[in-house]
Swiss-Prot record:
Lineage per the UniProt record: Eukaryota, Fungi, Dikarya, Ascomycota, Taphrinomycotina
Recorded GO MF terms: ATP-dependent diacylglycerol kinase activity; CTP-dependent diacylglycerol kinase activity; lipid kinase activity
Domain of life of the source: Eukaryota
Organism: Schizosaccharomyces pombe (strain 972 / ATCC 24843)
Protein name (Swiss-Prot/TrEMBL): CTP-dependent diacylglycerol kinase 1
Keyword terms of this UniProt record: Calcium, Endoplasmic reticulum, ER-Golgi transport, Kinase, Magnesium, Membrane, Nucleus, Transferase, Transmembrane, Transmembrane helix, Transport
GO BP annotations, alphabetical order: mitotic nuclear membrane biogenesis; phosphatidic acid biosynthetic process; vesicle-mediated transport
This protein's record includes keyword Calcium: yes
């Protein structure tokens, strides 16, 4: 007889707080761009935020009492595997910093959307239906990749089909027809999410790989 989980237990099992934060970054990126903020204004904020995030991890690795407090407060926003490892938010910040610093702004924003939404979708779909489909990489299922693909198509439609629709947008200037661009974006999101680059954190790999591929095709 199965025991019914409490909301707290169910939320922890499915990483609801972490996924909610992860997903919200995509909406926040759209909000910032919609309000007229640009990479040059956002990069210093990321650099400032990186300092306490990195320092906090260094302290908790060397001070058990602080580590217990840190995990009690920040723990719900972390994977279980991060409790004794570097916090994923550090890699998130590095990945976003790189794409904002190196790539055109629209490509940077799209790569953040793919990180924020495709990664969460792949994780959610993979946990639910991954056991019914083949594994395509370590901890990656075909079901999760299909979820990431659909979400990548959705990201492209929302961003370049609804949000950035002017004649000066990269999508409008691209020689690739928009429906094909949506499909390609889906493949890029799925590929980047499933990719294992020297064991690096997905939060770093997904935006950088996505931005590189988008830059090449656009």
């Amino acid at each position: 007889m199965s025991t019914k989980l409490t909301w707290s237990q169910w939320s922890k099992k499915h990483e609801i707080p972490r996924k909610a934060l992860h997903t919200s970054i995509g909406f926040f990126a759209l909000l910032l761009q919609g309000c007229g903020y640009h990479a040059a204004q956002i990069i210093p904020v990321i650099e400032i935020g990186f300092i306490p995030a990195f320092t906090g991890d260094v302290i908790r690795f060397n001070w058990p009492a602080f580590s217990r407090l840190y995990n009690r407060v920040i723990g719900p926003l972390m994977r279980e595997s991060e409790k004794n490892a570097w916090n994923g938010v550090i890699f998130y910040m590095i990945g976003v910093w790189i794409v904002l610093k190196v790539f055109p702004e629209e490509i940077a924003v799209m790569s953040v959307l793919l990180l924020s939404w495709c990664d969460t979708t792949a994780s959610t779909v993979g946990r639910k239906w991954g056991k019914y489909t083949p594994k395509i990489a370590k901890n990656k299922s075909l079901a999760g990749s299909l979820g990431a693909f659909v979400c990548g198509v959705f990201c492209c439609y929302v961003y370049w089909g609804l949000f950035r629709t002017g004649p000066d947008s990269l999508a409008a200037q691209s020689r690739i027809p928009f429906p094909w661009l949506c499909l390609i974006n889906g493949f890029i999101g799925a590929f980047a999410e499933a990719m294992d680059v020297w064991g690096l954190d997905d939060n770093l790999v997904i935006p950088v790989v996505s931005a590189c591929l988008l830059y090449l095709i656009m």
